[in-house]
Amino acid sequence: MSSILPFTPPVVKRLLGWKKSASGSSGAGGGGEQNGQEEKWCEKAVKSLVKKLKKTGQLDELEKAITTQNRNTKCVTIPSNCSEIWGLSTPNTIEQWDTSGLYSYPDQTRSLDGRLQVSHRKGLPHVIYCRLWRWPDLHSHHELRAIETCEYAFNLKKDEVCVNPYHYQRVETPVLPPVLVPRHTEILTELPPLDDYTNSIPENTNFPTGIEPPNNYIPETPPPGYISEDGEASDQQMNQSMDTGSPAELSPSTLSPVNHGMDLQPVTYSEPAFWCSIAYYELNQRVGETFHASQPSLTVDGFTDPSNSERFCLGLLSNVNRNATVEMTRRHIGRGVRLYYIGGEVFAECLSDSAIFVQSPNCNQRYGWHPATVCKIPPGCNLKIFNNQEFAALLAQSVNQGFEAVYQLTRMCTIRMSFVKGWGAEYRRQTVTSTPCWIELHLNGPLQWLDKVLTQMGSPSVRCSSMS
């Protein structure tokens, strides 16, 4: 390998001297072959950046920012259309559609453009250099937010993107206000069964590459088949243009019960040790043990690592009832899907060469779709599939409506996701249990919060039984 890196310029050595190790200190980490490969990769990444910045005269500004650790330094930019510079193929774009028509979001097609490739490893340039010089444990661009003075921040989608690591900050998880729950609430005389969309025929949606709708997109009325039982819920960007309130734009504190004279008890949210649990299915059969996710970033893939806390490897799992269709589908899972839990939000990114299909009631609520809508995520694209703050607002609102309304929210805490093969109205397979390979996520934090709220509210006056 020494022939590949015959000479390291002094400026590269200086910049590498400020590289943060996993322990948070500057300089190189420990030994070992893996660390040696990582060091060589970091050197290549820095060399590549230095070469570009020398051409634009920004190298001194980068070195100043890193050595002074000062956010008041200037932007340090490289071209954002790195798909051409680095020989990457044009990333997939996604269109949103359903049985009633086509909806296009052209403004969102660049959200995953500009990935940088260094020695067969791809990543967004500002993430690579923030990880190198500030946060070694950084997983995704979702964890970063640009400072207000950054003129070429990644989220601005300009022709140049700033890679000054001190122009970005880590996203902090927002503190959710407690939900005020009356100790005794008037309960419906009978608790209807929980809505189950497993066997319903969902609509299908292809979602834009970006995880947010454009600012100017406000659906006047949902398309046919997209009537949400909870009403339209819009993202924060959409709410800025709306006159009437929706659950997503109201904070939990504004939706707390207003029953005067009642004994209101605050029920707080707390993060569990495992933020989600994942079960794997082949057709209608559960396969293997439940995977409990403790890391903020994890992948569900088709490979065979048995002991990595950041990977749920489906390739290891055996099933005596596995048929040829399932076997063929498993071969195409590949790198699968990456799940992020960052800042109270859950994202799904398709790493596979084949699309993944997601049914997320929380996401569907946000865009005013039917709760059973299935969203297709092509390779290289990502989607926000859950938001704690939106859920908190809905929970606080539902407390006013009684035990049954709160109980119905449990369906929002379950997300189904199939690999390679989709299901729904536009597919031969009508239900998720007809797809060869799929997973079910249970979001433990929201589920435990619901449990505490329901416990505080008390049981329904008439319990469900075989006779009710």
Curated annotation (Swiss-Prot):
Residues of the MH1 domain: 10-177
Domain MH2: 275-468
Residue ranges that the Swiss-Prot or TrEMBL entry lists as coiled coil: none
GO biological process: activin receptor signaling pathway; anatomical structure morphogenesis; cell differentiation; convergent extension involved in axis elongation; embryonic pattern specification; intracellular signal transduction; negative regulation of transcription by RNA polymerase II; neural plate anterior/posterior regionalization
Residue stretches of biased makeup (Polar residues): 234-244
Region described as Disordered: spans on this chain: 224-254
GO MF annotation list: DNA-binding transcription factor activity; DNA-binding transcription factor activity, RNA polymerase II-specific; I-SMAD binding; metal ion binding; RNA polymerase II cis-regulatory region sequence-specific DNA binding; sequence-specific DNA binding
SUPFAM superfamilies xrefs: SMAD MH1 domain (SSF56366), SMAD/FHA domain (SSF49879)
CDD domains per UniProt: MH1_SMAD_2_3, MH2_SMAD_2_3
Pfam family name, one: MH2
UniProt keyword annotations, A-Z: Cytoplasm, Developmental protein, DNA-binding, Metal-binding, Nucleus, Transcription, Transcription regulation, Zinc
Positions annotated to bind Zn(2+): C75, C150, C162, H167
Major location category of this protein: cytoplasm
SMART domains tied to this protein: DWA, DWB
Cellular component terms per the entry's GO annotation: chromatin; cytoplasm; heteromeric SMAD protein complex; nucleus; transcription regulator complex
Subcellular location: Cytoplasm; Nucleus
Cited PANTHER family: MOTHERS AGAINST DECAPENTAPLEGIC HOMOLOG 2 (PTHR13703:SF42), SMAD (PTHR13703)
Function statement: Promotes differentiation of dorsal tissues. May be involved in the mediation of Ndr2 signaling during mesoderm and axis formation during embryogenesis.
Family: Belongs to the dwarfin/SMAD family.
Protein known as: Mothers against decapentaplegic homolog 2
Protein species of origin: Danio rerio
Gene that encodes it: smad2
